[in-house]
Amino acid sequence: MSKVAEELVEILAKRGESVTFAESCTAGLVAGAFCEVAGASKVFRGSVVSYANEVKRDFLGVSEEVLNGVGAVSRECVEAMAIGAAKAFRAQLAVSVSGVAGPSGGTPAKPVGCVFIAVFYNGQTRVVKCNFSGDRQAVRSQSVQTALQTALLVLNEN
């Protein structure tokens, strides 16, 4: 994990860019994993844990239509979360996560382990839908790994 975070820090520092995170089900674990890297402070602007829909709406700008329609665990929500975080923290790279970590809260359409991750960079957003298995800790751990790996993939493609 730290290897991926180290690469992210290195690339962002070389480019003179910064990163932010907007997290729901991971509750700050992605930012925490990123900041384990020495030198992360050069590129890390800050992050928000937006567990409550009101925070998603009021701080990150996720619309009521999204929250009341497709819901917080959706492609549309994580895309808006990432864009909102990039604006709020004035960061070039923004990563967002929202999902059902369990052990309860799942539905047939969005079972435990259903997690959406978005990476916003250069005006474009990549969203991935994951279906992780395991207990709450396993789902959250896999979410952190996938979020950082997806961010690195996006940076390497740009």
Where are these regions (language model features)?
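Short alpha-helical segments enriched in small residues
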Residues: 1-158
